Amino acid sequence: MGYERIQKPEGLLYHYTRKENLESILRDGRIRKFCDRETWFTKSLADTLRLMSLTVMQEGAAYYDARGRLQRYPAFVPEDYVVLELTPRYQSGEWVIWNQELPPNAPESVRELAEEFSHLKLGYRGDLKFWENPVIYEMTDLLEEPEQTLSLIHISE
């Protein structure tokens, strides 16, 4: 398991970030890697919202940070986040996915969720440059329509 090389994705990419990072991202014209070897993206707005529902929207849930330390997600504050719709500029770097590593006896439901999670995010090894004027979605606007959001993030009861 672990990293697997993939083909360069075609078309638009999406990246969620805290608003406090937006000014420097727009000024630099790139998404910079953060304490990791990769920068992470999704193929659609729906994938972005689903990824967020499995990560930053999980207040109190445990996760391992880029340095391998166990952390807990803080309270999710929608006003603090935006999603960028990016048109990547030519890059010659390597694209990867990270396949979640599980013990052999993991339940099928855990395996299915790990498979979904692994394929929601696309990693780029390096800083990804993008063309000017990306579309910026306010998280509060995306979450305003509960029924639409539920269908976008594939929550099943």
Cite the ranges covered by each PLM segment.
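ADP-ribose/NAD+-binding catalytic cleft of ART/PARP-like enzymes
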Residues: 1-40, 47, 53-59
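Short, charged/polar surface micro-motifs in flexible loops or helix N-caps
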Residues: 19, 45-48, 89-92
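Surface-exposed flexible segments
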Residues: 20-37, 91-117
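Generic detector of solvent-exposed, compositionally biased contiguous segments
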Residues: 43-69, 126, 132
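Charge-dense polyanion-binding interfaces
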Residues: 59-102
